[in-house]
């Protein structure tokens, strides 16, 4: 009879980070919020879809507020006190998400707009009439 081998189970160690970076990508259709440590490793994330919205409602400021609230609660639970915020995109959920992080009791260090702007790159699509 074959001898049974024991499996070694690795336990996930409790993560404590005092400072983090919040990346808010706000498009017209959705808002995606990612919380990383200063090195860029993802800790948690949320979006309009994970907050329970479907279709065009994912792009609303309220959906961004709920998604940011989920991420902020997770950050506070991990013991995070200070965050820097990087905002990308033209969507309507930008300000709502930033206000939610302030209301959650997190100290905001820097709010920076990192929306990519072309230096006369690709030709844009023709104008819709």
Swiss-Prot record:
Record PANTHER family: 40S RIBOSOMAL PROTEIN S14/30S RIBOSOMAL PROTEIN S11
NCBIfam families: PRK05309.1 (NF003698), uS11_bact (TIGR03632)
Species for this entry: Thermosipho africanus (strain TCF52B)
Protein name (Swiss-Prot/TrEMBL): Small ribosomal subunit protein uS11
UniProt lineage: Bacteria, Thermotogati, Thermotogota, Thermotogae, Thermotogales
GO annotation, biological process: translation
Keyword RNA-binding: yes
InterPro entries noted in UniProt: Ribosomal_uS11 (IPR001971), Ribosomal_uS11_bac-type (IPR019981), Ribosomal_uS11_CS (IPR018102), Ribosomal_uS11_sf (IPR036967)
Alphabetized UniProt keyword annotations: Ribonucleoprotein, Ribosomal protein, RNA-binding, rRNA-binding
SUPFAM superfamilies: Translational machinery components (SSF53137)
UniProt GO cellular component terms: ribonucleoprotein complex; ribosome
UniProt-recorded Gene Ontology molecular function terms: rRNA binding; structural constituent of ribosome
Similarity comment: family membership: Belongs to the universal ribosomal protein uS11 family.
Keyword RNA-binding: yes
Assembly and binders: Part of the 30S ribosomal subunit. Interacts with proteins S7 and S18. Binds to IF-3.
Gene3D superfamilies: Ribosomal protein S11
Function: Located on the platform of the 30S subunit, it bridges several disparate RNA helices of the 16S rRNA. Forms part of the Shine-Dalgarno cleft in the 70S ribosome.
Pfam families from the UniProt entry: Ribosomal_S11
């Amino acid at each position: 009879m074959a001898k049974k081998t024991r499996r070694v189970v690795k336990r996930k160690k409790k993560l404590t980070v005092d400072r983090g970076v919040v990346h808010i990508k706000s498009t017209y259709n959705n808002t995606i919020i990612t919380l990383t440590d200063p090195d860029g490793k993802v800790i948690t994330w949320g979006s309009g879809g994970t907050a329970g919205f479907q279709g065009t409602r994912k792009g609303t400021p309220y959906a961004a507020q709920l998604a940011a609230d989920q991420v902020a609660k997770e950050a506070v639970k991990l013991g995070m006190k200070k965050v820097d915020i990087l905002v990308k995109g033209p969507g309507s959920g930008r300000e709502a998400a930033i206000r939610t992080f302030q209301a959650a009791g997190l100290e905001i260090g820097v709010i920076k707009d990192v929306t990519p702007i072309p230096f006369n790159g690709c030709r844009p699509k023709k104008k819709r009439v």
